[in-house]
Design a protein with these regions (language model features):
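Conserved, structured core segments of small domains
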Residues: 1-105
Length: 105
């Protein structure tokens, strides 16, 4: 199992336009959380120009499937989205005894 970060780049008037789709978006997120796939999620602030959603799964499809089914994506509130593997170094299920080796963060 690994972690995957889903990044959303949203439209300029996202906050004003999201209301009709928010309940379904949150339902989708809650279901993914209950299945143990969605770990953390939230909008970026100041400015509200994106969102970050962290998933845990066997492959990046856990995150891309969410995005493809998200009402925010389907209704044009998300301009672009990207899934990237996330290497957890500290916290959660990270290996114990992390030291500064000068490598990746």
């Amino acid at each position: 199992m690994g972690y995957y970060a889903l990044f959303y780049d949203v439209v300029d008037d996202f906050v004003e336009r999201r209301a009709p789709f928010r309940t379904e978006h949150l339902k989708l997120a809650d279901e993914a959380n209950r299945r143990g796939e969605l770990v953390l999620a939230g909008a970026l602030a100041e400015p509200a120009d994106g969102a970050l959603i962290i998933f845990r799964g066997d492959d990046p499809n856990v995150a891309s499937s969410f995005a493809k089914n998200d009402p925010y994506v389907q209704n044009g509130l998300v301009k672009n989205w990207e899934v990237r593997p996330w290497t957890v170094v500290v916290g959660g299920e990270a290996r114990a005894g992390v030291s500064d080796t000068g490598g990746d963060a």
